[in-house]
A protein has these predicted regions:
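Residue-level marker for buried hydrophobic side chains located in beta-strands
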Residues: 4, 31-33, 60-61, 145, ...
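Active-site neighborhood of divalent metal-dependent phosphoester bond hydrolases
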Residues: 45-48, 53-135
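Active-site environment of divalent metal-dependent phosphoester hydrolases
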Residues: 10-12, 39-41, 67-70, 188-198, ...
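Short amphipathic alpha-helical segments
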Residues: 17-18, 45-46, 73-74, 158-159, ...
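Active-site glycine-centered loops adjacent to acidic/histidine catalytic or metal-binding residues
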Residues: 7, 35-36, 63-64, 189, ...
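A general structural motif
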Residues: 1, 26-28, 55-57, 141-142, ...
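N-terminal active-site segment of His-dependent metallophosphoesterases
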Residues: 1-49
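Acidic, His/Gly-enriched loop-helix segments that form or flank divalent-metal centers
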Residues: 100-211, 215-221, 231-235
């Protein structure tokens, strides 16, 4: 079975494990997390990141928040005269932007972990650098394209390799947008309630795409785990 979930934003790792247990998730199954496990709440998602390092049947697809964290990876470099000299206004702006987007809680958790186990922080950053921008999967007799945000400025017939990286992590689809005719695109990034109050806590399914972001970034709303094989939803 193939499962997807997105935009956990600091969701407690123990609650995620409970949710997976509720779905009957086992070693023969596969879970795709469609970006944004970090920032905003709790431990900033660092617990999930540590867990991911040892999961062979779970894959994080890069989200815009992971991309922002990677842009701030210089914070975990060894402090030298050169690194101090390189800390310019551009890096300050990158850091400020990340903090404005809820990155403080993740940076604090990583800083604490860096004192205890700097090699683990290095492993986390390396893991994030290797995360794919998208995945193409077939399950339950259907083809799916999985990414964080949908596809910005989508053009039918355009090669996926011709899109810039930001197209898969910073898109804000309109409800009437369409993607592939024969492949369902699954993403998060835009909380479904942003499309109207009638979609609050509900997955949106259109002819060509599915949005599974329930808005857990608020720290109160529960995320949804979707099993693609039969479209059954699981929640805590």
């Amino acid at each position: 079975m193939t499962y997807v979930i997105s935009d956990l934003h600091g969701y407690p790792i123990e609650k995620l494990k409970t949710l997976l247990k509720k779905a009957g998730f086992c070693e023969d199954d596969f879970l795709y997390i469609l970006g944004d496990v970090i920032d905003r709440n709790g431990d900033g998602g660092v617990g999930i990141l540590q867990w991911l390092l040892s999961q062979s049947n779970v894959q994080l697809v890069l989200g815009n928040h992971e991309a922002m964290l990677l842009a701030c990876a210089f914070l975990f470099d060894e402090i030298t005269d050169d690194s101090i000299a390189d800390f310019d206004s551009e890096k300050i702006e990158i850091l400020s932007n990340y903090q404005l987007n809820g990155g403080d809680v993740t940076l604090k958790s990583l800083a604490k972990l860096n004192k205890e186990s700097p090699e683990t922080v290095c492993d986390i950053l390396d893991y994030l650098r290797d995360c794919p921008l998208y995945e193409a999967v077939t399950t339950g007799g259907k083809d799916y394209f999985l990414c964080h945000s949908g596809i910005d400025k989508f053009e039918k017939g355009k090669k996926i390799s011709d899109y810039p990286a930001d197209a898969f992590i910073w898109a804000w689809p309109e409800i009437g947008d369409e993607y592939f005719d024969d492949i369902l695109t699954v993403f998060g990034h835009t909380p479904t309630m942003n499309y109207g109050e009638q979609y609050r806590n509900k997955i949106i399914k259109t002819r060509t795409w599915i949005d599974i972001d329930m808005g857990a970034a608020d720290g109160k709303t529960e995320p949804v785990l979707l099993r693609l094989d039969d479209m059954i939803e699981f929640r805590n």
